Swiss-Prot record:
CDD domains: Ribosomal_L31e (cd00463)
Presence of keyword Ribonucleoprotein: yes
Family, similarity comment: Belongs to the eukaryotic ribosomal protein eL31 family.
The organism of origin for this protein: Perilla frutescens
Entry GO MF terms: structural constituent of ribosome
Name the UniProt record assigns to this protein: Large ribosomal subunit protein eL31
Lineage start: Eukaryota, Viridiplantae, Streptophyta, Embryophyta, Tracheophyta
One of the GO biological process terms: cytoplasmic translation
PANTHER family found in the cross-reference section: 60S RIBOSOMAL PROTEIN L31
Length: 121
C-alpha cells in the first residue's frame, strides 16, 4: 500500500523520452490530413502518458512533423515529454505537459524504450 505522506504518481514533476509510432496511428488517414492528425495524436499520447489535459507542443517538434510536407509524416518520432508546474495563478490545471523533439541516436530507434530524464534545471 502507498504511504499516506507520498504524493500521487501523476502529481510529480518528471521528464521522460518516448518513441511514438506515428505510422500505426495515421494508417488510413487522408493524405491532406496527415500532418495535422499527427500533431493531434502526439497530444493524445502525451495526455495519456502524463495524465494532464494541458499539453503544449514545441515549435521545433511542429516543424519536424511538417518538414516533409503535409503528406509525408515521419513513421516514428522520438519525443521528450516533461510534466511541469503551471506558474500562472489563474490557470485551470496545476500541471501541464511540454512535448519537444528528442535527438535520435546514430543507431536508430530500435531497442530504445521509455527513459526517465533527470532535470537539468
Amino acid at each position: 500500500m502507498a504511504d499516506k505522506g507520498s504524493k500521487p504518481r501523476k502529481e510529480e514533476v518528471v521528464s521522460r523520452e518516448y518513441t511514438i509510432n506515428l505510422h500505426k496511428r495515421l494508417h488510413g488517414c487522408t493524405f491532406k490530413k496527415k500532418a495535422p492528425k499527427a500533431i493531434k495524436e502526439i497530444r493524445k499520447f502525451a495526455q495519456k502518458a502524463m495524465g494532464t489535459t494541458d499539453v503544449r507542443v514545441d515549435v521545433k517538434l511542429n516543424k519536424h512533423i511538417w518538414s516533409r510536407g503535409i503528406r509525408s509524416v515521419p513513421r516514428r518520432i522520438r519525443v521528450r515529454i516533461a510534466r511541469k508546474r503551471n506558474d500562472d495563478e489563474d490557470a485551470k490545471e496545476e500541471l501541464y505537459s511540454l512535448v519537444t523533439v528528442a535527438e535520435i541516436p546514430e543507431g536508430g530507434l530500435k531497442g530504445l524504450g521509455t527513459q526517465v530524464i533527470d532535470e537539468e534545471e
